[in-house]
Swiss-Prot record:
InterPro entries: IF-2B-related (IPR000649), IF-M1Pi (IPR005251), IF_2B-like_C (IPR042529), Initiation_fac_2B_a/b/d (IPR011559), M1Pi_N (IPR027363), NagB/RpiA_transferase-like (IPR037171). Keywords: Acetylation, Amino-acid biosynthesis, Cell projection, Cytoplasm, Isomerase, Methionine biosynthesis, Nucleus. One of its GO terms (biological process) is L-methionine salvage from methylthioadenosine. The gene is MRI1. Its EC number is 5.3.1.23. The keyword Amino-acid biosynthesis applies. The record marks C168 as: Transition state stabilizer. One of its GO terms (molecular function) is S-methyl-5-thioribose-1-phosphate isomerase activity. It catalyses: 5-(methylsulfanyl)-alpha-D-ribose 1-phosphate = 5-(methylsulfanyl)-D-ribulose 1-phosphate. Induction: By RhoA activation in cancer cells (at protein level). This is Methylthioribose-1-phosphate isomerase. It is found in: Nucleus; Cytoplasm; Cell projection. It is an enzyme of class 5 (isomerase). Catalyzes the interconversion of methylthioribose-1-phosphate (MTR-1-P) into methylthioribulose-1-phosphate (MTRu-1-P). Independently from catalytic activity, promotes cell invasion in response to constitutive RhoA activation by promoting FAK tyrosine phosphorylation and stress fiber turnover.
Amino acid sequence: MTLEAIRYSRGSLQILDQLLLPKQSRYEAVGSVHQAWEAIRAMKVRGAPAIALVGCLSLAVELQAGAGGPGLAALVAFVRDKLSFLVTARPTAVNMARAARDLADVAAREAEREGATEEAVRERVICCTEDMLEKDLRDNRSIGDLGARHLLERVAPSGGKVTVLTHCNTGALATAGYGTALGVIRSLHSLGRLEHAFCTETRPYNQGARLTAFELVYEQIPATLITDSMVAAAMAHRGVSAVVVGADRVVANGDTANKVGTYQLAIVAKHHGIPFYVAAPSSSCDLRLETGKEIIIEERPGQELTDVNGVRIAAPGIGVWNPAFDVTPHDLITGGIITELGVFAPEELRTALTTTISSRDGTLDGPQM
């Protein structure tokens, strides 16, 4: 078994089919943007950072094979249209949309250079996608380390170990590696300061039971799986020190879209006086939206709720509502928002990120908010 969600080399992309985990580890070749769209939509690959990476790398594979053109204008349009198509696969997560804007701008700027060639445009876009892969791994390690230190200072300033509850899957399988919220747990474990981790089952797709539990067992991190409906009991009776979750989109006021069930976790955590953290790269922050009310929430097929492994478990004829995400209001994020740039209170996020981005040169290395 492996925790490597994405295998990439110039001109070749493979993804780990996460629908088969933990029973089977099988890689699937992705040779086109259309194949990537299908894999993302089917949730063979999931997690906001991984979705963006697979989408953009699939475009890089096509460009390496000479797709696009002929002519600079046609090539730039090809890049823009392919990226726009990828955004439609799962619209709630902002990472793919941001990467699409950035890469389209890169292609357009390169095409405007004096003496520009199709080969140069392709090479520039490919290099930028490869840089994204490396940057995501660096950012995740920073998130893990910064989050672990902040959490320990908040809940265990005199030393000792902490117990953390998390939701869905935010680890190596959802990113280029290491993870965001699960990266914080990894960092706590490596410091010898993690007493225990609780992970939710995360219905209806069971990302917690299938993927997070798999990662925790793989790395021998002490952990217990619970159902989504057990979180209040766990906080009341199992000594939970903090809750750390990931994010698919964080907007300007700190409202956060994440896997459905996150909102209720935050409510229960506040009731019990337990710090609630969101761990996400700055690429998951969307300062163009003011509040969570503006976030488009993806709704998934009802069959995902009524059937398990192809066997129907719900009464025939029952109606189904299956939103993939919910929005946690910023005032419930009591621990802070952990990014690779630091840990910020929700009300600090806009200023902190705007200040950081304005000090950069506006290239792909500095995500445009």
